[in-house]
Amino acid sequence: MQHLRPIRRALLSVSDKAGILEFAKALVERNVELLSTGGTARLLAEAGLPVIEVSDYTGFPEMMDGRVKTLHPKVHGGILGRRGQDDTIMEEHDIRPIDMVVVNLYPFAKTVAHPDCSLADAVENIDIGGPTMVRSAAKNHKDVTIVVNSNDYEKVIEEMDNHQNSLTLDTRFDLAIKAFEHTAAYDSMIANYFGQKVAPYYGDTSQPSGTFPRTLNLNYIKKQDMRYGENAHQQAAFYIEENIEEASIATANQLQGKALSYNNIADTDAALECVKSFSEPACVIVKHANPCGVAIADTLTQAYDNAFKTDPTSAFGGIIAFNRSLDAKTASAVIERQFVEVIIAPSINEDALPILATKPNVRVLACGEWQEAKPALDFKRVNGGLLVQDRDLGMVKEENLRVVTQRQPSEREWKDALFCWKVAKFVKSNAIVYAKNDMTIGIGAGQMSRVYSAKIAGIKAADEGLEVAGCAMASDAFFPFRDGIDAAAMAGVTCVIQPGGSIRDDEVIAAANEHNIAMIFTNMRHFRH
């Protein structure tokens, strides 16, 4: 049963007026009476549409600079009145049924995002009447339609045309859910903003805020359900942020292949965020959230070839990310050489698509171009709580780099050291990366002791016949003992880049000098757990 409800009267009051004029015209053409307020009413009247000001309907003027517009029983009675149950009381008080409410709220997020926003500015952009009408209409969705998103205007008109100016209960219920999500997100923004304020300062300028709110309110939109989670016995879904500003796995458009799995998404994110660190043509191959091969080169194909050489065994069934549009030559190299789960790039050249289509199960994603990384929060759930930190966007600056050994790095060693330092940031701790001539030659990831990560990196290089002699080594954190340097020297490393800061730095530096290794301190750690 559809539980149709006809639309005879609608109240329109929107801050974002995109599409509202066309929507209002469509309603008038379908004999819907329009009620409206403030700027929305003026817009409709200037367009020649018949509209009744809410103040004329209620007999009560807007007041207090617009703070009080719709907070009146004749408005909320018309929205909340239950058809067939409250009709007598509505008639007694001349309350007319309002069948549709079209509302979106004051632009609070846009206001507080401005660097000069004061607390007073923020307060004036807290909508009161809007959320009240939205929640009232959503509560009474059995009889009333609530529309909070302009993307739904066309859908509403189409359904009215299909049902003699009526809407189904399924549609009203779906729109009510969107409405509650809308007001929840709005209240969360306000709570987060006020929760960061250290004092009720009402000056004309913005006030310094705390980093984190007292109560953390998060709103994410479900993009897709997964077949299962990290393991087959776990259920999972993928949620994304609203209004994403940075190219990412969340913005990616899948061009071909099977549905992305939970692990695909996690690994693709790791690969993409790593490859975005490089300005030169670059390729990153990831397996189980760790880079197993990274390279930069003059061409994308050469970058892929060199990244693959690091660890061909681990690259099998991996995730491959590029920071340039994927061309046909590089696509051919990948498809002809290896089994791959996911390929992601800013875009895919037209001539590469038929080549990729020969392997229809390969997931191919285009995420769009990116500029600089945006500040954001990272989360890690622990049992009973949530760890929150700002995103690791730390970049070493030249003035912070310090050579602490007797020997200075050569120009080639400098370049390789800075290259593998970028990679180490994206390797699970304890992380050790060997690099030479713009490519990784060995990666030691996730070991409980740093010296074993160093040994593993050397073993990886030896297994693939890659020459370690003269290479650079990066460590994501300081060496607590000299044994890591001794292991690196034994493998053939000639330059080390690491944060420094151990109580045994002198011992570690002495070991580097003994082995004639150049060592650079960055004064920045990049743990990744």
UniProtKB/Swiss-Prot annotation:
Query: What pathway is this protein said to act in by its record?
Result: Purine metabolism; IMP biosynthesis via de novo pathway; 5-formamido-1-(5-phospho-D-ribosyl)imidazole-4-carboxamide from 5-amino-1-(5-phospho-D-ribosyl)imidazole-4-carboxamide (10-formyl THF route): step 1/1; Purine metabolism; IMP biosynthesis via de novo pathway; IMP from 5-formamido-1-(5-phospho-D-ribosyl)imidazole-4-carboxamide: step 1/1
Alphabetized GO MF terms? IMP cyclohydrolase activity; phosphoribosylaminoimidazolecarboxamide formyltransferase activity
Residue ranges of every copy of the MGS-like domain listed in the record: 2-148
Enzyme Commission identifier(s): 2.1.2.3, 3.5.4.10
Per the UniProt entry, what are the Gene Ontology biological process annotations, in alphabetical order?
'de novo' IMP biosynthetic process
From which source organism is this entry? Proteus mirabilis (strain HI4320)
Q: What is this protein called?
A: Bifunctional purine biosynthesis protein PurH
Report keywords, A-Z: Hydrolase, Multifunctional enzyme, Purine biosynthesis, Transferase
Question: How are the domains described in the entry?
Answer: The IMP cyclohydrolase activity resides in the N-terminal region.
Tell me what reaction this enzyme catalyses.
(6R)-10-formyltetrahydrofolate + 5-amino-1-(5-phospho-beta-D-ribosyl)imidazole-4-carboxamide = 5-formamido-1-(5-phospho-D-ribosyl)imidazole-4-carboxamide + (6S)-5,6,7,8-tetrahydrofolate; IMP + H2O = 5-formamido-1-(5-phospho-D-ribosyl)imidazole-4-carboxamide
A Pfam family matched by this chain, by name?
A: MGS
Its family remark reads: Belongs to the PurH family.
Annotated Gene Ontology cellular components are:
cytosol
